[in-house]
Amino acid sequence: MATIIINKENFYHNLNQIALKTGSVEKIAIVLKDNAYGHGLQLMASLSAEFGIRHAVVRSMEEAKNIKELFRTVLVLGDHAVKDDICSFALNCLNDIENAELGARVELKVDTGMHRNGIAPEELERALQMIQKKDLELVGVMTHFRSADEMGSELFWQQKQFASVKERVKEAGFMNVRFHSHNSAATLRSKTFDEDLVRVGIGAYGYNELPDVFDDIPLKPVLSLSAKKIATRRLKKGERVGYGGDFTAPEEMTVSTYDLGYGDGWCRGDSAHPYITAEGLPILGRVSMDFIILESAKEELVIMNDAQKAARQFGTISYEMTTALSINIERKIVDR
C-alpha cells in the first residue's frame, strides 16, 4: 500500500510560526478532527504534546478517547455532552444544553454570522440561564469565522459581534471562561491577538489559504504521499492503458502500476486532464480503485508533497486532499 510521510521538522516549524503570532504555545489548540486532517490522529497528537501543546480539538468523543491523556483540555465539537475531567463539549444550539449530562464541561458556540452552528446572539442570555439551571460547567465561549481566508471586511464585522458577546457573558457573571474565535486564517492575518486560544488546523499542517497579500507567514507542508511499484511492462506505440483505454502510448514506452487508487482516498479526477505528480509525471489513463499507472520503473514515487498544489489540479482545496486519505495507509514520521 501507499505510504504517508509526516515531516516532524516542518510541523514544529509551523507551530513555532503560529506561536509567534499568539505570543505563547500555551494559547494554541491543535485541531485533530477527522484523523488530524488525514495526517493521523494519534501520531499528530503525540507530536503536538511533545512540542508543548496543551489543548486539542476533535470531532467526536471517540476521537477524544484516543488522545485525551496527552492534553490538559480537549474540546469535542460534535458529540453529546457528558461529564469528563478533560473533555469539554461544544453547545451548538439550545437543545444541546437540554440534552447535556448534568455537570458536563461545556463551551457555548455563538453564531456571529456564519449561520452554520451556534446559538443566535439574541439567545445568549437564555442560554446562559439554561446552563446555570442545568448545573453545567461553562469553560468556554466561541464562534467561527466564515470568510477569514478571503479579502473583505466580514472578518472584522464578526469580530465586532463576538466582542459584544464577550462583554455580555462577563456581565452575566461568567468570569472564568475562555474565549476563542480564531481559526488558522484569522490567526495568520491578525496583527494582534487578545483571546485565550486559537484553534489551529490547516495552518499547523502547512497550508496558508489566504490571498497572496497576506502570504508572509512561511509555512511548510507536513504530509507527503508516496506509492510503491507493483509491476512494470513495455508498451508498444498505439497500445492503450487501463479502464476504457483512455491513454494511448504515443511511442514505445515503459510504464508501471503503483499501489494507490481512489480506494485509498486519492481523487479519481479526469483522465483527459491528468494529475501531474510531485516528480513531474502525469498519471496515465484512469485512476483505478487500487492502482495508478505512470511512465516510470522506479520502485517508489512521490505522488504528492504539497496538498495545496495538488488541490489546484483537481479544482478543490488542500483540506479535501488530505482528509480523504484512507486511515489504512501507513503513516511514518521523519525528522526532516
Swiss-Prot record:
- Molecular function GO terms recorded: alanine racemase activity; pyridoxal phosphate binding
Q: Which reaction does it catalyse?
A: L-alanine = D-alanine
Q: Which cofactor does it need?
A: pyridoxal 5'-phosphate
Q: Which UniProt keywords apply?
A: Isomerase, Pyridoxal phosphate
- Indicate whether Metal-binding appears among the record's keywords: no
GO BP annotations of the record are:
D-alanine biosynthetic process
Q: Does the keyword Membrane apply?
A: no
Q: Where is the active site?
A: 33, 243
Positions of post-translational N6-(pyridoxal phosphate)lysine modification: 33
GO cellular component terms given for this protein: cytosol
Q: Name one Pfam family in it.
A: Ala_racemase_N
- Reported EC number(s) for this entry are 5.1.1.1
Binding residues for substrate: 116, 289
Q: In which pathway does it act?
A: Amino-acid biosynthesis; D-alanine biosynthesis; D-alanine from L-alanine: step 1/1
Superkingdom in the source lineage:
Bacteria
> Its biological function?
Catalyzes the interconversion of L-alanine and D-alanine. May also act on other amino acids.
Family to which the UniProt record says this protein belongs: Belongs to the alanine racemase family.
Write the protein's name. Answer: Alanine racemase
Species of the source? Sulfurovum sp. (strain NBC37-1)
Q: What lineage is this protein's organism placed in?
A: Bacteria, Pseudomonadati, Campylobacterota, Epsilonproteobacteria, Campylobacterales
Q: Which gene encodes it?
A: alr
